[in-house]
Regions:
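Active-site-adjacent beta->alpha loops and helix N-cap segments on the catalytic face
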Residues: 173-184, 201-202, 225-233
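Active-site-adjacent C-terminal substructures of enzyme catalytic domains
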Residues: 203-311
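A conserved glycine-rich beta-strand in the N-terminal activation segment of trypsin-fold
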Residues: 27-36
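Conserved phosphate-binding/catalytic loop of the ribokinase/pfkB sugar-kinase fold
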Residues: 140-164
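Charged helix-capping and loop-helix junction motifs
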Residues: 115-118, 151-156, 227-233
Length: 311
């Protein structure tokens, strides 16, 4: 393998990074040397000899990241501060995540909007943060760890003017208002993902035709794969119009479920961490603690993950 990006530009002062395994975004390769000059890749070539690193990969993009360790995307007060967002960005960068969406979960809608504004205001100090993913409060019947008392039906008035910086919205698909809500958001360039819901086939088709293009964390908080009944997981797997997130921490889904997703839908799987700030005051107030490999509510309900995309 010898992929020259531009061999004429190779310079003696370029940095050469060697790794025993190199993932180029599609294929996992063997020992590789990558030559970099001023942040630009000049060449990618097979390498013979000792390698400095075990694995080299492009930076990860995480579309669903609620926080990490003691830093929540919601912040510790009215919203996240610039210092908190910068700390979160630094922790993720150290773990290989170079781009990510700050994910805000179900809460009072005014508080969600305020927190979205806080992320946008603080983002200049966190270059990895691309914007916000609103995972709630417009969810369906499969709520998981979300606060049922704060869930709202899809609101077209909100969709007509979503908070600046909102790039992705998760919504339920069962409500009669869902297609109009989706159409309004999609028309404004917001990616709409179906999640925390158990739609019928008719509801699914209406929402996808309206502009929904993703599914949030496949297999989790949705109607499961079934050979006869309406199954959101199955519809997502077979519908080529849809990409989907997958929490491949082997707690949220099994290894066989991961294999099924990649086999059934090559090119449509988006790995997400769904990591949470399991050590922040908000999690502690809810009684969230690490048990059996993931953060959980006192009743055992999964409340996100404790891993970055690098594992």
């Amino acid at each position: 393998m010898k992929d020259k990006v531009d061999s004429s530009r190779a310079r003696s002062d370029a940095e050469v990074i060697t790794a025993s395994r190199f993932f180029d975004g599609s294929v996992l390769r063997g020992p590789t040397a990558v030559r970099v000059h001023k942040g630009l890749v000049e060449s990618i070539e097979d390498h013979r000899g000792l390698c400095e690193h075990y694995l080299l990969s492009p930076g990860f993009l995480d579309l669903q990241m609620n926080g990490f360790d003691a830093v929540s995307c919601a912040g510790s007060g009215a919203g996240i501060t610039a210092a908190e967002l910068a700390e979160l960005d630094s922790m993720l960068l150290a773990r290989g995540t170079t781009r990510w969406l700050a994910t805000l979960v179900t809460d009072d809608l005014r508080r969600v909007v305020s927190r979205t504004d806080s992320v946008r205001a603080a983002a200049s100090g966190a270059p990895g943060c691309l914007g916000v993913h609103l995972e709630g409060p417009f969810l369906g019947s499969k709520l998981g760890a979300h606060d049922r008392a704060r869930v709202l039906p899809p609101d077209t008035a909100f969709a007509h003017s979503p908070p600046a910086g909102t790039l992705l919205v998760t919504t339920g698909a069962e409500s009669t208002e869902a297609p109009a809500f989706i159409r309004e958001l999609a028309g404004r360039g917001v990616v709409v993902s179906l999640g925390h819901t158990a739609p019928s086939r008719e509801q699914w088709d209406q929402c996808v035709r309206a502009g929904a293009s993703m599914v949030t964390h496949l297999f989790n908080a949705m109607s499961p794969v079934h050979h006869r009944d309406d199954s959101m997981a199955l519809m997502a797997l077979v519908d080529d119009r849809i990409n989907f997130g997958l929490i491949a921490d082997l707690v949220h889904v099994s290894a066989d479920a991961v294999r099924l997703a990649f086999s059934a839908a090559p090119g449509r799987v988006c790995m997400v961490s769904d990591s949470v700030a399991w050590n922040d005051p908000g999690s502690q107030r809810r009684g969230i603690e690490l048990r059996d490999g993931a953060p959980r509510l006192p009743d055992g309900t999964l409340a996100g993950s404790s891993t970055a995309l690098s594992g």
